[in-house]
Amino acid sequence: MKSALPIALAIGLASPLACAHHGVASLGAAGLEGPGAPIETSSSATLPEGKWLGLVKLDYAKFKTYDPSTAVGNQEVDYNQYWMVGIGYGFKPWLSIYAIQPYNIKVDEYGGTNSRGPTDLSLAMVVGFKYDDKFMLVPANESLDDLRDWHFTVNLGMSLPTGDANHTIGSPPVIDPGKALGFGKASFNYGLTATKQFSDNDTAVFELNQIRFQRYTYDSGDSMKFGTETRINAALSHRLMTKPENKFRLDGNVELNFLRLGKDNDSTVPGPDPDTGGDILYGVLGLRFYKDNMSLGMAIKKPIWTDLNRTPGTVLQGAEGKEKYRFVTTFSAMF
């Protein structure tokens, strides 16, 4: 039986860490041999016991614009940058813990109101198990044949209200929940992943997760409860190249990311806001490079189908599902 290479690369994959409406953080692990790992869909890999992972992720969202006027007050959302810096630790072969600190930059067209700063710290626990005649926790050592078994993870996480939910923008200063630097209260997330390597070069990955929010009352007296976010993701990773002598691997990835947004409940609007929420299907094409103990992933993500809630005449510019494209890149290293 072939043995797996001793170098395991921990990499950033999209996991249900609570950074909703503000980008989604990522977790996972893979090696130069064995299952591949997508860019935006969480794999079912955990960190090796006693190993640390450092990761950085950027999700750059460029939005479509609809109003050609440059008059004051007509500025539309230009782009958002969702940065994340995180660290993970493998307490057991089957148990990994992560902490992620996001930093958001939200920029309007020239003359608009911008927002930037650190947002709510997120924590996550990932428990890994597999099926080999029976369900079991992931063991410390697995052969390449063992890695072809179905692997799963259960993910539990929350965000802590460390960001400034009452961050103000404009003149006179106002609080815009969509550009706030936090949710004001903890949010909670949970999810499942499943991974199956079905050939030497091909791996299928599936993910289901959900994020729930609490109502928060701002200093202005208004309150907001963001709608629940549900994600269903599927991905195929194909190994394009491996050079063991250089500890190098290159994978190509194709993904479908489905996002269901619940309606926001804003105290300034009677009942759930009719111009929020809906369904979005994103297509993702990406590459992942592995070298030594490092990994770099890059992908283009675009909405290919949407069914957004809106009242007649509402454009929803700057909303999820209205992007021209999203560029996602992740870098991670294990130590």
Language-model region placement:
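Surface-exposed strand-loop-strand hairpins of Gram-negative outer-membrane beta-barrel proteins
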Residues: 23-31, 59-83, 170-183
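Hydrophobic, lipid-facing positions within transmembrane beta-strands of outer-membrane proteins
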Residues: 37-39, 50-52, 56, 81-85, ...
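Residue-level signature of outer-membrane beta-barrel architecture
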Residues: 45-47, 58, 89, 101, ...
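Repeated loop/turn-to-beta-strand initiation elements of outer-membrane beta-barrel proteins
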Residues: 52, 94-99, 131-135, 201-204, ...
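Transmembrane beta-barrel strands of outer-membrane/channel proteins
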Residues: 56-62, 99-103, 152-160, 206-210, ...
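Outer membrane beta-barrel transmembrane domains
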Residues: 65-73, 220-335
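Outer-membrane pore/translocation modules
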Residues: 105-221, 225
